[in-house]
Amino acid sequence: MEVNTLAFIAVLLFLAVPTAFLLIPYVKTASASSGSN
């Protein structure tokens, strides 16, 4: 199966960008709550 590099990068960005937007606030709140705990 031939994988188009450009398509692979596009899918990777398409998945990574929303994931980062969700993970960054979660990690901040998680580290803040664990730090105060």
Curated annotation (Swiss-Prot):
Instruction: Specify the species.
Output: Pinus thunbergii (Japanese black pine)
Keyword Acetylation in the entry? The reply is no
Task: Indicate the principal place this protein occupies in or around the cell.
Answer: plastid
Q: Which residues cross the membrane?
A: 7-27
Output the InterPro entries linked to this UniProt entry. PSII_PsbM, PSII_PsbM_sf
- Provide the alphabetized UniProt keywords: Chloroplast, Membrane, Photosynthesis, Photosystem II, Plastid, Reaction center, Thylakoid, Transmembrane, Transmembrane helix
Q: Which Pfam families match?
A: PsbM (PF05151)
Localization, per the record, is: Plastid, Chloroplast thylakoid membrane
Q: What does this protein do?
A: One of the components of the core complex of photosystem II (PSII). PSII is a light-driven water:plastoquinone oxidoreductase that uses light energy to abstract electrons from H(2)O, generating O(2) and a proton gradient subsequently used for ATP formation. It consists of a core antenna complex that captures photons, and an electron transfer chain that converts photonic excitation into a charge separation. This subunit is found at the monomer-monomer interface.
User: Where is it found, in Gene Ontology cellular component terms?
Assistant: chloroplast thylakoid membrane; photosystem II
Q: Which domain of life is it from?
A: Eukaryota
The Swiss-Prot or TrEMBL record describes its family as follows: Belongs to the PsbM family.
SUPFAM superfamilies tied to this protein:
Photosystem II reaction center protein M, PsbM
Subunit (UniProt): PSII is composed of 1 copy each of membrane proteins PsbA, PsbB, PsbC, PsbD, PsbE, PsbF, PsbH, PsbI, PsbJ, PsbK, PsbL, PsbM, PsbT, PsbX, PsbY, PsbZ, Psb30/Ycf12, at least 3 peripheral proteins of the oxygen-evolving complex and a large number of cofactors. It forms dimeric complexes.
Biological process according to GO: photosynthesis, light reaction
> HAMAP family this protein is in?
PSII_PsbM
The taxonomic lineage of its organism, from the top, reads: Eukaryota, Viridiplantae, Streptophyta, Embryophyta, Tracheophyta
Q: Which gene encodes it?
A: psbM
What topology does it adopt in the membrane? Single-pass membrane protein
Q: What is this protein called?
A: Photosystem II reaction center protein M
